[in-house]
């Protein structure tokens, strides 16, 4: 594997010669069910073949050294395996360091450190979960190298905890779950309330999943993500006065409509409407896919984007332009923003023979309107994080 050959060379330069183990952790794309995970709803993500690679060698002391080939300007980051705390100096390394700390807090302290080289081929800031990819990768590395025997769902929870508590990003469980539990050629229907899940075979009948990157820089931590979460929680509190529910995901559309007036704030009401309707849309979409009705699945993806645009307001001109252009193209069954929003990517279901024209037409019109070009990736649906 050419990637690993290059990584071996850099590993020797940075850390010296050592016997290394190789690991890989995918990125993810969510097909439908956006901003529902922390609202106790369903999501339908899959792991993709782009992701994060690592080479790992054990050390004899209690220190770890990390180096990212993607961010060489940051140099080697050194940190203690015990009692690590977040610091701006660590930069990107706060994600893997957070996992070390969460595992230590959960009673899985490491007896020694590691030298770890990272390389990712996920486009930066594309909203394809590069942070979750690194977190789950680190959890899998520690579990494997230290022989801890922790099951993947627990590793996923520890990775999410690292992002919530250590990094300070209030994300739901979807990203880490998709990265850890991904399965080739399948998407995962996950109930974020209970973590009950099942795999659904992605047979798209002569169509492919095309990811289109706006190429607009974004950082979720500094965007309005946490604000949306607070608005949804405020709406839930209002609804709990009249309905015995723990999350918005428990409501049907009709139940929400009957009780929506108790949410006095109009913005909070729209946020909650998205969460409830999107959850139902997701269940309907999976049902359609399992009945081989790819057309209906695509139409529900379009509805999802409209709801994210109008009720949840997390799209923005770049994502809206991509989705609206996709809807106009021949051979496109559905298209929507995926991920947290504000920038990042759309996901489209496109007939295989229409992909070249789709890419050409969307690229030309998007560049003319936005001023820079988008990028396209045809997604290969892959297995979750693992040792290679």
Model region roles, listed by residue range:
Residues 40-47, 228-229:
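Short Gly/aromatic-enriched secondary-structure transition segments
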Residues 132-133, 345-349:
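FabD-like malonyl-/acyl-CoA
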Residues 1-28, 53-89, 186-334, 349-388:
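C-terminal nucleotide
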Residues 33-35, 47-48:
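N-terminal cofactor/phosphate-binding cores enriched in small/glycine residues
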Residues 1-23, 29-33, 42, 79-81, ...:
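Gly/Ser-rich oxyanion-binding loop with an adjacent helix/lid
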Residues 342:
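Glycine-rich phosphate-binding loop
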């Amino acid at each position: 594997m050419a990637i690993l050959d290059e990584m071996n060379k850099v590993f020797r330069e940075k850390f010296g010669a050592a016997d290394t183990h190789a690991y890989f952790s995918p990125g993810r794309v969510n097909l439908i069910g956006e901003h529902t995970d922390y609202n106790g709803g369903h999501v339908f993500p899959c792991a993709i073949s782009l992701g994060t690679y690592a080479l790992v060698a054990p050390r004899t002391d209690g220190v770890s050294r990390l180096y990212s080939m993607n961010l060489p300007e940051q140099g080697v980051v050194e940190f203690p395996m015990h009692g690590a705390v977040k610091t701006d100096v660590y930069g990107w390394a706060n994600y893997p360091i957070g996992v070390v700390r969460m595992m230590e807090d959960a009673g899985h302290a490491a007896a020694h450190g590691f030298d770890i080289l990272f390389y990712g081929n996920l486009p930066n800031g594309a909203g394809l979960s590069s942070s979750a990819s690194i977190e789950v990768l680190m959890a899998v590395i520690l579990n494997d190298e230290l022989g801890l025997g922790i099951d993947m769902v627990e590793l996923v929870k520890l990775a999410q905890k690292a992002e919530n508590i250590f990094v300070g990003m209030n994300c739901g469980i979807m990203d880490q779950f998709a990265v850890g539990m991904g399965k080739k050629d399948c998407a995962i229907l996950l109930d974020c309330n209970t973590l009950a899940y099942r795999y659904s075979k992605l047979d798209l009948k002569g169509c492919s999943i095309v990811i289109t990157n706006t190429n607009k820089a974004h950082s979720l931590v500094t965007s309005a993500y946490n604000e949306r979460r607070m608005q949804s929680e405020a709406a839930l509190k209002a609804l709990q006065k009249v309905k015995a529910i723990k999350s918005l995901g428990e409501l049907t559309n009709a139940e929400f409509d009957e009780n929506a007036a108790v949410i006095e704030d109009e913005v909070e009401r729209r946020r909650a409407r998205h969460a409830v309707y999107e959850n139902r849309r997701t269940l309907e979409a999976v049902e359609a896919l399992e009945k081989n009705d790819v057309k209906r699945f695509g139409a529900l993806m379009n509805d999802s984007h409209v709801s994210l645009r109008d009720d949840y307001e997390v799209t923005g001109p770049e994502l809206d332009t991509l989705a609206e252009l996709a809807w106009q193209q021949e051979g496109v069954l559905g298209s929507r923003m995926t991920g947290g929003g504000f920038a990042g990517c759309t996901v489209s279901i496109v007939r295989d023979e229409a992909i070249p024209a789709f890419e050409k037409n969307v690229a030309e019109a998007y560049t003319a309107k936005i001023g820079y070009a988008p990028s396209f990736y045809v997604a290969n649906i892959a297995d979750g994080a693992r040792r290679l």
